[in-house]
Regions:
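Ferredoxin-type iron-sulfur electron-transfer modules and their immediate structural context
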Residues: 1-77, 81, 86, 94, ...
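Flanking helices and flexible, charged tails adjoining ferredoxin-like Fe-S electron-transfer domains
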Residues: 32-63, 94, 102-211
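Short, flexible active-site loops
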Residues: 86-89, 126
Length: 211
């Protein structure tokens, strides 16, 4: 099963994933034309700001199995396509915007936006669909393609988990001083961004204390 794997420690909150997602789900598939579309295309991934400046978490649908949203939908608008049964999709024409799916979603990733596919372009439940149309064309999800720091990866879930597990094992080795900490360094641009955010956060905290 393929999925989008998130490395929150690498996210710098640049929101490139959000922009790419919105464009991928626009009518024109073009950044410069998408901003003039009605309704304006919206992202299905949300890079939320963390507690410390310059830290963020790219939150998106996890495509749960079983999916609580699918179970409570009274109109069967939420379903799994035959060719990609691991993906949970929403049919805009069947959605009545009752909000039940958003209420039961444990990750708060279902939002309501106007859709060109909905009757009268009304607001309907909207969430990540793993860029199913792109996958059908042999492409990876737009958010993964846009991420420049490796915070989002796409692939077989077991392989991605194994890679992450190996990394955590290396972290334990570093803590025991068995290997150099250099192997665990984040990309220079990520570390610099996080250091800047931490420094500004400390300055703001000192200012509040009157230091």
């Amino acid at each position: 099963m393929k999925t989008v794997f998130i490395h929150p420690e690498r996210c710098i909150g640049c929101k490139q994933c959000e922009a790419a997602c919105a464009v991928a789900h626009s009518q024109s598939k073009n950044l410069f034309l998408a901003v003039f579309e009605v309704p304006t295309p919206k992202p299905r991934i949300h890079a939320e700001q963390g507690l410390v400046l310059n830290t963020a978490f790219p939150n998106k649908c996890r495509h749960c199995l079983p999916a609580p949203c699918q179970a409570v939908c009274p109109t069967a608008a939420i379903y799994r396509p035959m060719d990609f049964p691991e993906i949970v999709q929403i049919h805009p024409k069947k959605c009545i915007a009752c909000g039940m799916c958003a209420m039961v979603c444990p990750f708060d990733v279902i939002t309501f936006y106007a859709s060109v596919q909905a009757p009268d372009k009304s607001s309907v439940a909207t969430k990540c669909d793993h860029c199913i149309e792109r996958q059908r064309q042999g492409q990876i999800p737009a958010c993964v393609e846009a991420c420049k720091v490796g915070a989002l990866q796409f692939g077989e879930i077991n392989e991605l988990v194994k890679s992450a597990r190996t990394r955590y094992s290396e972290m334990v080795s570093v803590s025991l001083a068995q290997v150099s900490a250099e192997i665990l360094r984040q990309p220079d641009n990520v570390e610099a961004w996080h250091r800047q955010g931490a420094a500004i956060s400390r300055m703001n905290a000192d200012e509040k204390k009157g230091v």
